């Protein structure tokens, strides 16, 4: 969350079971991306998405790199959100037939039609992303309606409008080159160093001169 041109920072981060006591930008991750695998458990017959991912290799079925499991990317292709008549990066072709075959396995498992299955995948992943947005806004005391929503990353713009509707955030902004926005920021942002140390003393003994001398 960015307010007054400054990103929110937290002093410690928990990675798995490790508490990292170092300042970092307050980022909340969610196991939902273009490569997240959708599946229907035999026991519940309820559609689920992620956290397992097909990654870049073998990737979604539409990449034709060996991946056959249905992913969020394949659902976007089936629904036409990701056109199959364009080349990713000017080189990679999208195979819609492969996406249809992958998503059809979900439809057959749930006894619904192809489009309904694809829509179900997208609705689930949008709700997962919405939950992450709530963590950095509503649960921190901020109203998302007071902010614009920026969609970036490889698949972010595909879901940005739906998330704008869910959060009532306006406007929804898609920056130029959304797939490389993080890399661009990493290359151009100013480096900031911080240092801290513990200083123990009695308040009655503390003076400006003593503090300057000790530190």
What label would you give each PLM region?
Residues 1-215:
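N-terminally biased helix-coil "hinge/interface" segments that flank
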